[in-house]
Amino acid sequence: MPITEEITERLGNSVTCLRQKYLTEEMLSIIGNMDVLVGVRLHSLIHAAIMDVPMIGISYDPKVNSFMKSMGMKALCSVYDFEGEYLCEEFGSVLENREKILEKVKKHRDILVGRLNLNEQLIKGLLEGEEKICE
């Protein structure tokens, strides 16, 4: 059984599984209205961070683990060792500690945005031929 079907089956009506394609703006709007996002794909987790939504990552690839680590969190499990009861427990914990988790998400997101801005400045400096771009 695909993992999304198992999640939906175990959590019932409190879960919506998105199966169609959406424009980025639509997806951000949908995610922004969620209490918690359970994501397998990297971009769903990135969108949750952008929209200040607590996330639970289920890893299928090391990049998901790396992103969750950069957010000060860990992926709950991998798609290969998924256990529905762990997700239910984590889901409840995230809802219970939502505000504290949101603070962590915002803090780590802001750190990543700062790194992105620095990279942008460095690239711009290289393109403009600046001799000294780092101190």
Predicted segment positions?
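Active-site anion-handling motifs in enzyme catalytic cores
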Residues: 1-135
